[in-house]
Amino acid sequence: MNITFIGSGYVGLVSGVMMSYLGHNVTCLDNDEAKISKLNKRILPIYETKLDKYFTQALEHERLKFTSFYNEELKNTEAVFITVGTPSKASGEADLSYVYEAIDKISLHINKDCLIVIKSTVPPNSCNNIINYLKEKGFSFNVASNPEFLREGNAVEDFLYPDRIVIGVNNKESEDILRKIYMPLTDNGAELVITDLVTAELIKYGSNSFLATKIAFINEMANLCEKIGADIKNLSKGIGLDKRIGTAFLNAGPGFGGSCFPKDILALNSIIKNNYIDSKILEAVIRSNKERPSLMVDKIATLLDEDLKGKNIAVLGLTYKAGTDDVRASPAIEIIKNLLDKGTYVKAFDPMGLENSQKTFQNENLLYLDSAIKVCDSSDAIIITTEWSEFQALDWQKIYSLVKTPIIIDLRNILKADEVESIGFRYYTVGSKI
């Protein structure tokens, strides 16, 4: 089928590349001409595990094109996916201005049988509102909801082997088109959840907010473990092996970040409030996660004898999680800001997130370096803020010989305590008694 993606950010680009792998002819359209220029030069503007392989393959098979022009090509598309951003307003509500901008532009070019698919995360009833908006302008396109559930760092596998594919439709024609698009995956065993438009939209918000709640819960359990001497790793395992709960998202750490969880839980909380419902759970999760970076810095201060002023801190990890170059709402960046506010000097490294971090945040007392070894040299403490496997494989014996004070504060609990302690490091984790 001929498919177009409007918006070539993380979701649009990954989905476009992988749709072409399924055999569809895909055009990715974006207003950012510099990004499109890069893509046409076969340069991926994001890092995502394994994506480069499928990107190259799609281009070689001539099933993937990039453009910044809304033109005649859209007349041949059978489905156009809206994958633009829906950032948070100050109120927490989702800003749909980019969605409506895309709708306005494509409605002038697509044919009457083309299906508009909203893949951007939008509040419940957005698709119905878009249908009414188009009718007011004299258009009668079918509109469907198809939320994405790709995890950054694991997006390729998530696309190929999804837990479920959710589609929200209000007629058989829309359902048939989406069934045809996803047939290569459903024939391979992927479960298709077909529902109405509003429910499909709400599934995405509910899923992300529930996962965020699991993270906030285990972080609060880690706080308790530190007070009473319990072991957070075994606690997480003992809870998570209950099949009703599951082990995913039960790793204690510095909090959740990224482009989805913080934004989506704020939006869902706003939706609930706007419907005159008291949202105690979500508000508690939002507050707990917002406070998490400062709690981590308080922990660091306690371990470094309270006064952080003038300390040289090495920070390993800038992205909000491993496997991506995304630093949006990253706990690591917030921790660095808190450390700088307390008068520290920070050197930071990340295997994939350096460039985005440098664009996002600069400070005269913050130095970004291109290796973990350089960052750790002469440090008063090493803070691990992202769970990159590269940090587990570092030459800790060599690092021990370079540091000023042999202290590791592992906010991701990824190192083996006996190994680094046998070298001579004082090693502290999240969820261990201070």
Curated annotation (Swiss-Prot):
It comes from the Bacteria. GO terms for molecular function: NAD binding; UDP-glucose 6-dehydrogenase activity. Its EC number is 1.1.1.22. It is an enzyme of class 1 (oxidoreductase). Coiled coil: none annotated. InterPro entries: 6-PGluconate_DH-like_C_sf, NAD(P)-bd_dom_sf, UDP-Glc/GDP-Man, UDP-Glc/GDP-Man_DH_C, UDP-Glc/GDP-Man_DH_C_sf, UDP-Glc/GDP-Man_DH_dimer, UDP-Glc/GDP-Man_DH_N, UDPglc_DH_bac. Substrate binds at residues 148-152, 204, 208, 249-253, 257, 321. Gene3D superfamilies: Cytochrome c1, transmembrane anchor, C-terminal, NAD(P)-binding Rossmann-like Domain. Transmembrane segments: none annotated. GO terms for biological process: polysaccharide biosynthetic process; UDP-glucuronate biosynthetic process. Keywords: NAD, Oxidoreductase. This is UDP-glucose 6-dehydrogenase. The lineage of its organism: Bacteria, Pseudomonadati, Pseudomonadota, Alphaproteobacteria, Rickettsiales.
